[in-house]
Amino acid sequence: MAKHIIVIDIVGLERKHISENLTPNIFNISQTGETRNIETVFPAVTCTVQSSLLSGSYPEIHGIISNGLYNRQDYAVSFWEQSSNLVQADRIWDTVKLRGTGSKTAVLFWQNTMYSNADIVLTPRPLHMDDRIIMWCYSKPPGLYEKLFQKIGKFDLSWYWGPLASKKSSEWIELATEFVLENEMPNFLFTYFPHLDYAFQRNGTSYNNIKDDLKFIDDLVGRLVKKATNIGIIENTQFIIFSEYGFTDVNSDIPLNTIFRENELISVREIEEVEYLDLEYSKAFAMVDHQVAHIYVKENYANSVKKILEGIKGVDMILDNESKQHLRINHPRSGDLIAVSNTDKWFSYYWWFDPSKSPSFAKKVDIHRKPGYDPVELFFDPSTRSIPLDGKLVKGSHGRLPSEGETKPVYVSNKKDISVTNESDDLSIVTIGKYLKNLL
């Protein structure tokens, strides 16, 4: 059994991207092990998939029902909350502590890892001052980020999200991963390379520079393999590469809250000529996340909301209590209804009729004040020097479970001992998590 497990989350990677010529390092890893399509969880979004893999359980258990959460008690939506305590199931590092194996765990740039039981944690945590933002990362042990800062430079949050998001984020994270691998020698190391995610959302699944981006990500994998070789652990190391989801090409958004407002379900408060959502008095609203929307409905309005959803072009499915159970998303945090878009659509959070009445944060990179995920933050309008309000700019999305023949995420390893099912079958993300826990 391997003494070191290195798990690399390469967002958006698919089986068709892997070849000896284009991605030789990833290809070589697969040659002594296996390559499998992944059966991901619903919704196929970052926080949900990561929690499912790390805990070996479904959202109905761990409670991370999307990248955002809605607090019904104080009518508040929050996206990208980092606290580990939000995950309601034991993850790999918790199991390590319970079993007392002495294994050391490290996790870099995964979601919901602040204050976790992992021995080593690194995650972006910018500090918002009155006049500026301090680019900082939370680290455990304290001082780890400061050591990295001295060795490889600061982590710039604009590389990680927004109009300037780029492969620089993946490159910095890889360098940090090398540092942790060499200096801490963890038994379990989880790291994250995000830059394909930006490219697919901006450009769709078949953009011109995709080969360059794949070669770049493959070079990063090669650097980690080389580092494991140089520090003498390669013979006792299992590499696992996986992706959280595949992308579909999209051509426009569906502004569910605007439609709900047209049907007098959404209430707003106008303050200084700006319209803000009033969730206290709204009969229903949608917390949107890519191609999935959790819809929270006041009592006695479920049937009318469902009827409205059924009439919206581009809405593929509406999940009620029974279908939520079938997809293992029946958790108290979930919406009363869940809408799923067609493959060529995604849900935007917009609620205004007149863009001039939209809040100032709508035209900024502001991941915490918007009641939904906003991929348009990847774009910039030079004429207004702000984030545009045009959902048609987005060309790729995810979140829905793939239908037959659609693209799926991929699992690659240099070991072949995960084959608990027929090798022709897809490998469940939950099965991967249970497998990892059994390696302890």
Describe these PLM feature segments.
Residues 89, 277-435:
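Active-site neighborhoods of enzymes that stabilize oxyanions during catalysis
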